Design a protein with these regions (language model features):
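Catalytic machinery of carbohydrate-active enzymes
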Residues: 1-337
Length: 337
């Protein structure tokens, strides 16, 4: 296929974290087919985030109704890549008669795609973002694209330095922080995940890190998690000065706040993956389930900026870690240049 100004539809229409993990693949797509128009179909809660991605040209919300067909039909797409195939989306792409329809070779939905890649993602043999990159590289084979550029490193979501500096100073003033000390965000919410770190262990991490330096601790949360955040604050207020961020229903607000922190500590949730896309230093806590490993759901920040801990399975309700060993590793990461 000649590489004209191709119109490419990419689909990841579910959660924030899942969408974030397609960003390296989409960057590779844009860098190798620079004249393409990339349109991204996303869920409503991801729309604001997708619109911040400079390599995505247009964003369409999956309305899940008959109007979606008309909205997509007008583009005349040459290519569609569904990073997660569902029967509804597969049928829609087939109905649109898009010449190249590519998806993972899984489930019944694969019957609607004329190009498929067998991946077996549940085996967790590589990071999710690499499975996504593999799909894009499969497209390059299909269109006979050679001389593929090496994948760019993060950040995949960007703010210019002046904006971050201004936002950081505003944040420090709003929350009365020490401007000379690093800002550490802790996000105790699990976002619906089965297990997360206990509030006691989040508290132990704060108290342990405070022994190294007088860090600024901020509890980050969504609107739904405000009470959990306040419970954490109450549990450690006597030992550590810690503040709860004002929660709002806004991805842009979350993005702006996370962009100013020096480290983000959380379970495998959407906010952790946003921090990774911003190339922040991240500390993630993962269950020991095969389909939820730290390798599979690795953040997309640079290697030297990420640290992960896997559940030692000492507690059926919470992820358990060796606090003393973990503290030393976390302190080493935050003190690195």
């Amino acid at each position: 296929m000649a590489r004209k100004n191709q119109k490419i539809l990419i689909i990841r229409n579910d959660k924030i974290g899942d969408f974030t993990l397609i960003l390296p693949a989409v960057v590779s797509l844009k860098e190798n087919i620079p004249n393409s128009t990339i349109v991204c179909l996303v869920s409503e809660n991801v729309k604001e985030l997708a619109e911040q991605c400079e390599f995505i040209d247009e964003v369409i919300v999956d309305t899940k109704n008959k109007m979606l067909y008309s909205s997509l039909k007008r583009y005349g797409f040459d290519i569609a890549i569904s990073f997660f195939s569902t029967f509804r989306i597969g049928y829609l792409l087939k109905k649109l008669d898009i010449p190249i329809r590519l998806a993972p070779k899984t489930k019944l939905a694969q019957i609607f795609f004329n190009y498929k890649l067998y991946q077996q993602r549940s085996s967790s043999k590589k990071p999710e973002y690499e499975y996504n990159i593999d799909l894009v590289h499969e497209l390059f084979k299909i269109i006979n694209l050679i001389d593929i550029k090496e994948m760019s490193l993060g950040p995949y979501l960007k703010y210019d330095h002046a904006t971050i500096t201004e936002n950081r100073m505003d944040f420090i003033k709003e929350y009365n922080l020490n401007p000379d000390k690093k800002i550490i965000f802790l996000h105790p919410g699990t976002g619906g995940a089965a297990k997360g770190l206990s509030l006691d262990d989040y508290g132990n991490i704060c108290k342990g890190l405070r022994n190294f330096d007088d860090y600024n601790f901020i509890i980050h949360c969504s609107v739904e998690e405000e009470q959990l955040a306040r419970d954490l604050k109450i549990s450690i207020d006597k030992d550590v000065t810690i503040r709860v961020i004002e929660a709002k229903q806004s991805i842009l607000y979350m993005l702006k706040n996370i962009s100013i922190c020096d480290m983000f500590i959380a379970g495998s949730t959407g906010p952790l993956h946003i921090a990774g896309a911003l190339n922040k230093k991240t500390v993630g806590f993962y269950p020991s389930k095969k389909s939820s490993t730290s390798l599979r759901w690795q953040t997309i920040n640079n290697f030297e900026n990420r640290l992960s801990f896997t559940d030692m399975k000492n507690n059926k309700n919470y992820i358990s870690i060796d606090i003393k060993k973990s503290l030393l590793q976390i302190q080493k990461l935050i003190s690195s240049i």
